[in-house]
Structures are given as structure tokens and as C-alpha cells.
Amino acid sequence: MKKKRFYIRTGILLVLLAALGYTLYSAVFQNTESVAVGEKAPIFSLEDVDGNRLKLDELKGKGVFLNFWGTWCEPCKREFPYMANQYKVFKDKGVEIVAVNVGESNLAVRNFMKDHGVNFPVVLDKDRQVLNAYDVTPLPTTFLINPDGEIVKVVTGEMTERMIHDYMNMIKPEGSS
């Protein structure tokens, strides 16, 4: 009887260890990114708070600073003034900001925009399809897209104003001053 119990416990322990090992292997060694640097950015079409449709492929020829954010996200709140300042500098140099709000209401986003003086396009990803297409986990996450529509860098986490300036400079079209 004791021997049978020993084998059952050992079997259960081995199954648990195998499951743990597979989970760790999957998390560490398998690349689950849907998009990566050097790939074409997934095309999407989303509406802003006023119902106007923004299509990513219509921005081809411009550098795109694609930022995923939420009104509840403290680092996002700190980044927005920096993004607004740099948008003033780069919007006439062929760089566009597209801020993708994730899963929030028009009212919440509209109030946030008013409170933070947002001067760049903000679109709503209410069903999180674009978030999932880009495989975004933490907020904020920013994709830098060159004028050819290729992802050149992915930035996870909060950025300083200097970083935002440098990244926008990196994606501006050649020949822009």
C-alpha cells in the first residue's frame, strides 16, 4: 500500500515538474511576437473620438510613432506632454503620432485629451484587435515605423522627452529638415 502511494505521488510530481518545465521553456525560448523589427507594420483602420477613420496605410511615406496607451496608465500620462511637444516639432517634417487607446470609452478618452492638451491623432481600439495584432502586453508600448511601413524599433515602457525626440528624428523621412 505504501509503495503504491509512493508511485502515485512520484508520478504526480513528475507531471507537475514537466508542466513547469514546459511553461518556463515556452516563456523563455519561444518567440511569441506577432510583429518584429524589420517587418511590415500590420495595417489597421480605427476611429477617433469624433468618428473619423484613420487608416495606417494612408500614412505611408511618413514616419509613424505608434503609441499604445490607457487613461489609467501613469507612465502614459507622463509621456503625453512630451509627445505633444515633439509633435509640434516633427509634424511638418513628415512624422505622425498615432496614439491607440486600448478598450476605453469615448468619454474617458475625450476627457483625457482635453485635460492633457493632446494635439495629435488618438484612435480607439475598443475590441483590442490592433493591440492583439501588435502583441502589445505592457502599456505604454511604442512602435516606430519608417516611411516604408517597416517597424524599426519597439519601445516598451515610459520614455523621456529626449528619447521621443531622438526616436521621431530616427523615423522622419529622408530629406526632411
From Swiss-Prot:
Its main location: membrane. Residues 35-173 form the Thioredoxin domain. It holds the Pfam family AhpC-TSA. Disulfide bonds join 73-76. It comes from the Bacteria. One of its GO terms (cellular component) is plasma membrane. It is found in: Cell membrane. The keyword Thylakoid does not apply. Coiled coil: none annotated. Keywords: Cell membrane, Cytochrome c-type biogenesis, Disulfide bond, Membrane, Oxidoreductase, Redox-active center, Signal-anchor, Transmembrane, Transmembrane helix. GO terms for biological process: cytochrome complex assembly. It is a single-pass type II membrane protein. The chain crosses the membrane at residues 10-29. GO terms for molecular function: antioxidant activity; disulfide oxidoreductase activity. Pathway: Protein modification; cytochrome c assembly. SUPFAM superfamilies: Thioredoxin-like (SSF52833). Thiol-disulfide oxidoreductase which is required in disulfide reduction during c-type cytochrome synthesis. May accept reducing equivalents from CcdA, leading to breakage of disulfide bonds in apocytochrome c; following this reduction heme can be covalently attached. PANTHER family: THIOL:DISULFIDE INTERCHANGE PROTEIN DSBE. Belongs to the thioredoxin family. ResA subfamily. This is Thiol-disulfide oxidoreductase ResA. It comes from Bacillus licheniformis (strain ATCC 14580 / DSM 13 / JCM 2505 / CCUG 7422 / NBRC 12200 / NCIMB 9375 / NCTC 10341 / NRRL NRS-1264 / Gibson 46). The gene is resA.
